Amino acid sequence: MEGVTGVTWTDDVVPGTEQWQRFRRLFTGEVNACVEGLFTAGATGVLVNEAHSSQRNLLLEDLDERAVLLTGRHKPLSMMQGIESDVDGVVFLGYHARAGEEGVLSHTYLENSITGVWLDGRPAGEGGLNAALADEHGVPVLLVTGDDRACAEAADYAPSAHTVVVKECVSRYAAICRPPARTAADIRSAAAESLRLAGRTAGDVRPHRIEVEFDAAHLAAAAAVIPTVEQVDVRRVGFDAPDMTEAMKAFKIVTTIAARAVQGIYG
């Protein structure tokens, strides 16, 4: 949701605020533009997996009736739930840049506590992690939308994917935003064009290592209590997994434990 046009501030994406109510509509509008483009190009079905915060932000009553919505929390594969089913491509809509980089509301999973994530030694954000999981299932990333920094980041993990820049980052809390009518038109067009990339292939199943760096030492210590997770530095933990699916399950546990260990204003 942080990568939707107009979104620049915490209240824009925090459930329950007045601004969040406004941006739920804009978020749903961008999703509908994508859905329309995919069906126009010949898609036979679209599953929308809602994955921001409570994962209950999109307005089902306003969703394109040809799509179906996966909403709610505690999904085994989180943002990528559904990848294990018969899908031929994925779209990352409303994405943001990774933690530690410039970008509107940039972060990786936790808003502030994580300062960096590395997948097999390379920096990775939510897009990079999710793309690796898609690759394990042989599913290509068709389209990425968000600010200019998120789209530039996509070139590293999904070089063949189409991108739509809906706003240009000025700072973590400011952006030059394009009106929804214009971004919707571009998303619709790019989604239609991107469908030519669709097609499931043999998956790349192999072991992976993830390392996570936090902004405070006690968060790393808390995460290191998890079996198989080791504390490799004062603020960093790492773990190995036999495949990306298991790696993401372990990553989810690490972030959950770390989030619980955050203590008030001191973090």
Spell out what each predicted region is.
Residues 1-2, 51-52, 93-99, 148-150:
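Short glycine-enriched loops at secondary-structure junctions
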Residues 9, 29-85:
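Glycine-rich nucleotide/cofactor/substrate-binding loop typically near the N-terminus or early
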Residues 11-34:
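Short catalytic helix/loop segments, enriched in acidic residues and glycine
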Residues 46, 183, 188-267:
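C-terminal accessory domains and tails appended to enzymatic cores
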Residues 49-50, 90-94, 144-145, 213:
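Short beta-strand segments
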Residues 65-80, 116, 161-168, 172:
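Acidic, His- and aromatic-enriched active-site or binding-groove loops in soluble protein domains
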Residues 75, 111-137, 143-149:
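Active-site glycine-rich loop that binds ribose-phosphate moieties when present
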Residues 136-141, 145-193:
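Active-site rim beta-loop-alpha module in soluble metabolic enzymes
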